[in-house]
Design a protein with these regions (language model features):
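Extracytoplasmic/lumenal acceptor-recognition loop(s) of multi-pass membrane glycoenzymes
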Residues: 81, 85, 462-487, 499-568, ...
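Membrane-embedded helix bundles of polyisoprenyl
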Residues: 23, 112-129, 135-217, 229-249, ...
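Periplasmic/ER-lumenal interhelical loops and adjacent helix-loop junctions
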Residues: 47-59, 91, 226-227, 234-324, ...
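Hydrophobic alpha-helical membrane-insertion signals
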Residues: 5-81, 480-499, 503-518, 522
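Active-site-proximal, structured, solvent-exposed surfaces of multi-pass membrane proteins
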Residues: 3-6, 55, 647-786
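Contiguous transmembrane helix-bundle modules in multi-pass membrane proteins
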Residues: 179-180, 199, 330-492, 739-786
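Active-site lumenal/periplasmic loops and adjacent helix-entry segments of GT-C-fold
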Residues: 29-167, 191-195, 278, 289-301, ...
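Membrane-interface helix-loop-helix junctions at transmembrane boundaries of multi-pass membrane enzymes
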Residues: 220-228, 317-341, 453
Length: 786
């Protein structure tokens, strides 16, 4: 059985406009709050504030200026690999390039509204084939655009790019298989791949599930010829969109966060039983803030995008559909996805079998759930027969959440308490809003289901309720951190000129921050030790743990690790004024207050060592392991860490560090080591947008150290001749120079980018020829019919 696409005038732009203006109304009150409170542009919480706003502004300026190496990204990282996961392939980012970089923070909300509109339009286009009623197809698009997943992931922003584009690829697959339409599917495959390679891996898995479920339900019928053509178009689309894939893949293979396999029972069972409860209730209750745990306290729940909630209608329509159409492909898809959600290894299949738990693939079955719900509602007799029972079941299951608020237990003092909730008020707000949606839907069903404009009434109700629950979610997320984030704009956007005027520009140096927001380096265009990005140079991930710094999604060296600042050429620390007393109480060696801005007190490092210097001694890995990780930076200020091969090659230039020096880790010894490194500094150092240059004038041959993350993309020359780059200190770089005056140049080229760009360019050319052939064939067929 085949389902030809519903033939009626498209209402795409009507859905687009409905979703866009609903999103405008959703964000407008919070934008007004920020403006009235003196905060300027809309800011939210967590990742949105610390990453998305500054990523968009920084990347906008970086792309316009050109370059390949970003000094403002942590200790320095390749720009492409650092930002391809977040925005570099997104069409929404490239659209934002028409906006001046300085105005990008104000463009974030319009972009969010646009993404929701595109998502709603895409959901509608996909659903109209299956729902076969324009009004109910429009509702499907609105449900998808304002699902709990979309509202939750405003927090992450760039996840909504994927939500927006995916329905178009799924609709193109249906067109290719059912209607034998050629040419569109490769385009959408390419666009989704280039938009986000990480999510595309999950999309590929889902498309396979969807394809086989459609075939099992006899909606997809294709012979060998059509199957080969579909495989060809898939491969062509992947080739067209692989421009960022190869560079990202080469980098991710070295990133420890991407290599985290399961073992034993981990394949089959989640480590905490409450994880199952959280998954179950994710379809019933509207989502809480991404950084809170209320209903369940154990398990991996924060920042996981664990929600499959649909506004107003909830899961009732999906349950009724699955009972009514047991052999429909949608039922198969939803059942397979439920199984995937509850089995760890199947859930991780959407993330290349990484054992870290996420539910960031739920938007795909949510789209099918929207289609199934509207399919049912568009058929009055079927809905009349099945929906009431499903609605009663949904109501009952939702009410069971109250148990968590009243179940008895014991507190730390042995007293009887009721409820297992950390913040009951938050729970009751979420539960109350969810129940309000159920009641409204039940009343509308009872009084309006037989009205001629029932579909339009329910669509209006869904959009109105989306404003209510969406605003509650935004409020729970945004204002819970208001005491922390209310000064975001003052400490970032508004401080750019003040900080630039306060900091000298006489040499290259890094900065640090204390008690401030993440990623100040991007705002002030300087390398900063406090940095929040998951895809920085892999050698940063290797280096930091060796000096006592946990490096997962953040670089956050403790202030007490003061010797690390000397090693990494940190000259100034920007201390938020409300944290200055806390900073001074630490009484860290070598810091003097030298100035201030409206937002920060500036402390200068008396033990600052300019970038690029030499050593008198080397230390071995065995020696360094005898020193605690938190104190190794003190030794690395005294001696460079070399492996056995490097000792054989450069041992004649350096003395082995005596073992007794390993215990000499006093503050005075650190200051003396920094003074020695300053005295052995290069004659000049210049950071460039493709790497750096340096000049040396040493009396003897030397191994010159640079605290720049090692990367295979770097090549080096000394006096114009190629030079080998040494990986030292578990992830930083050094180069050998002869005695006398020398010019060193390090140039960064993104590994794999040239190859992948050539593949994409060639594939796009082939795709163009393919489209031309399709057009000529179509024109010929039209001519023959005449």
């Amino acid at each position: 059985m085949q389902t030809t696409i519903f033939k009626q005038k498209s209402n795409y732009w009507r859905v687009f406009a409905l979703c866009f203006f609903t999103a405008v109304l959703l964000f407008a009150p919070h934008c007004i709050v920020d403006a009235v409170a003196g905060g300027g542009c809309f800011h939210y919480a967590g990742d949105f504030n610390d990453q998305q706003i500054n990523f968009y502004q920084y990347a906008n300026a970086f792309v316009k200026n050109g370059g390949s190496f970003s000094w403002a990204t942590d200790l320095g990282s390749g720009f492409v690999n650092s930002y391809s996961f977040y925005l570099l392939g997104s069409p929404f980012f490239w659209l934002s390039m028409v906006v001046p970089a300085r105005l990008m923070p104000w463009a974030m909300v319009p972009l969010l509204c646009l993404k929701m509109a595109v998502a709603g339009g895409g959901g509608y286009l996909w659903a109209r084939r299956w729902v076969r009623d324009e009004t109910w197809s429009m509702l499907a698009g609105c449900l998808y655009a304002f699902s709990g997943f979309s509202i939750y992931n405003i927090f992450f922003n760039h996840f909504l790019d994927v939500v927006a584009l995916f329905p178009y690829m799924l609709a193109a697959l249906d067109d290719a298989v059912i209607d034998d339409k050629k040419g569109a599917f490769p385009f959408w495959v390419a666009l989704n791949l280039v938009d986000n390679y990480f999510f595309f891996a999950g999309q590929a898995v889902f498309l396979i599930i969807y394809f086989f479920c459609m075939a099992a339900g006899r909606r997809y019928e294709l012979g060998l010829r059509k199957f080969v053509r579909l495989a060809w178009e898939t491969a062509l689309g992947c080739a067209c969109g692989c421009v960022l894939l190869l560079p990202a893949g080469l980098s991710l293979l070295q990133n420890p966060r991407t290599i985290d396999p399961f073992s034993g029972y981990g394949y089959l069972f989640y480590g905490k039983s409450q994880q199952y409860g959280a998954i179950f209730y994710s379809t019933l209750l509207m989502p809480d803030a991404p950084y809170f745990k209320d209903l369940f306290q154990e398990g991996i729940l924060k920042h996981t995008s664990l929600t499959a909630y649909l506004p107003l209608v909830g899961v009732a329509g999906g349950l009724a559909f699955c009972r009514a159409r047991e052999r429909h492909p949608f039922t198969y898809v939803l059942k397979v996805c439920v199984a995937c959600a509850f089995v760890p290894v199947l859930n991780s299949a959407f993330y290349a079998l990484n054992s870290s738990y996420y539910a960031r693939w739920y938007y795909m079955p949510i789209l099918v759930l929207c289609g199934a719900t509207c399919y049912l509602l568009s058929r009055p007799a079927l809905a009349e027969q099945r929906l009431p029972r499903a609605l009663r079941l949904t109501t009952f299951l939702t009410l069971t959440a109250v148990v968590f608020a009243v179940v008895p237990g014991k507190d730390d003092d042995g007293n009887t308490v009721y409820g297992v909730l950390d913040e009951p008020a938050r729970f009751w707000a979420i539960f109350g809003m969810t129940m309000l949606g159920i009641v409204i839907f039940a009343l509308l069903w009872h009084f309006c289901r037989n009205k001629r404009r029932w579909g339009a009434i329910l669509t209006a109700a869904v959009l109105g309720f989306s404003l209510l629950y969406g605003s509650l979610h935004l409020s729970l997320t945004k204002y819970a951190q208001w005491d922390v984030d209310s000064n975001l704009i003052a400490e970032t956007y508004d401080s750019v000129e003040d900080v630039a005027a306060a900091l000298p520009d006489d040499a290259f140096y890094r900065i640090d921050a204390y008690g401030a927001h993440n990623n100040l380096g991007l705002w002030f265009n300087r390398s900063c030790l406090q940095f929040f990005n998951s895809t920085v140079a892999p050698s940063i991930m290797a280096f930091y743990p060796e000096v006592g710094v946990k490096r997962d999604v953040n670089s956050k060296p403790d202030a007490e690790n003061y010797a690390l600042r000397g090693l990494l050429s940190v000259r100034y620390t920007l201390v938020a004024k409300d944290k200055e007393t806390e900073w001074t109480d630490k009484d860290l060696p070598g810091w003097q207050r030298t100035g201030e801005t409206d937002a920060y007190a500036l402390y200068e490092n008396e033990n600052w060592v300019p970038m690029g210097f030499t050593y008198d001694c080397y230390v071995t890995a065995d020696q360094l392991e005898r020193v605690s990780e938190e104190e190794r930076a003190q030794i690395l200020c005294r001696a460079i860490l070399l492996d056995d091969d490097q000792i054989s090659a450069f041992g004649s230039l350096l003395e082995p560090l005596p073992d007794e020096e390993l215990t000499n880790r006093s503050e005075d010894a650190y200051a003396a080591d920094c003074a020695a490194r300053r005295a052995a500094g290069v004659a000049a150092f210049t950071a460039t947008d493709t790497g750096f240059t340096a000049k040396t004038a040493y009396d003897a041959d030397e191994l010159v150290f640079f605290s720049v993350p090692y990367d295979d993309g770097f090549s080096a020359t000394v006096n114009g001749e190629p030079a080998a780059i040494e990986k030292v200190d578990d992830g930083l770089m050094a180069v050998y120079v002869p005695a006398g005056e020398n010019e060193i140049e390090f140039t960064y080229h993104t590994p794999g980018l040239r190859v992948s760009a050539c593949v994409s360019a060639a594939a796009i050319a082939v795709y163009g020829v393919y489209l031309l052939g399709i057009m000529r064939k179509r024109k010929s067929q039209l001519g023959s019919k005449r």
